[in-house]
Design a protein with these regions (language model features):
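ABC ATPase nucleotide-binding domain "signature" region
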Residues: 27-28, 34-39, 63, 79
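A short, proline-enriched helix->beta-strand linker immediately N-terminal to the Walker B motif
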Residues: 41-45, 74
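C-terminal portion of ABC ATPase nucleotide-binding domains
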Residues: 8-14, 66, 88-133
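Conserved catalytic loops of ABC-family nucleotide-binding domains
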Residues: 70-81, 87
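Helical segment within the ABC ATPase nucleotide-binding domain
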Residues: 61-73
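ABC-fold ATPase nucleotide-binding domain signature/coupling loops
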Residues: 5-34, 49-52, 56-59, 126-133
């Protein structure tokens, strides 16, 4: 689910690999995927992801959230994100502007009616391209 298996198995000792203090032997994305895996294994009622996939590329991030949608149905997931690609598959999205909630709806409805969301979406679309995952 956390998209960590491939890079773990590529390590010399695989799942027995020693990780240095503060994870200095890992990339930022690898650290994030291990942290997510550790949280998922605990099977909590609520998972809060506060920009926890910001170091992941868009493809890995899309795979991560798709796997969570498919395999973690009994856990409430709250995702704090700056990328529309991260938030667009959520049941509901809260849009903040200057720390104030300006809208709360689905991706499709926000695209149709929320100027702040439209601006964010359009600026990110130009920078990153539209991820359809």
């Amino acid at each position: 689910i956390a998209q960590a298996t491939e890079f773990i198995e590529s390590k010399k000792d695989g799942f027995d690999e020693y990780v240095e203090e503060k994870g200095t032997s890992l990339s930022g994305g690898q650290k994030q995927r291990l942290s997510i895996a550790r949280a998922i294994v605990k099977k909590p009622e609520i998972l809060i992801f506060d920009d926890s996939s910001s170091a992941l590329d868009l493809v890995t991030e899309a795979k991560l959230y798709k796997a969570m949608r498919e395999h973690i149905n009994d856990t409430t997931r709250i995702v704090v994100a700056q990328r529309v690609a991260t938030a667009k598959n959520a049941d509901k999205i809260i849009v903040l502007d200057g720390g104030v909630i300006v809208d709360f709806d689905t991706h499709e409805n926000l695209l149709a009616s929320c100027e702040v969301y439209q601006d964010i979406y359009n600026s990110q679309l130009k920078r990153e391209g539209d991820s359809n995952e």
